[in-house]
Amino acid sequence: MQRYFAKDYDKNLVLENSDIHHIKNVMRMKMGDLIEVVYNNKLYICRIDSFDPFSLNIDRVIEE
């Protein structure tokens, strides 16, 4: 599972544009795939909910 680091948490975890590009175009992940997101030393297991041209919507599944 791929791990990414969020830069902000305002209702949703916010990833860098380069991470979004990596998820969509390099890893070719699809809706429903799981990723690990770290924010404030907490690990979240997240499911990809939808893609927009410049954003990625994820649902937080598990907080570890």
Q: What are the functions of these language-model segments?
A:
Residues 1-64:
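N-terminal positively charged helical leader segments and presequences
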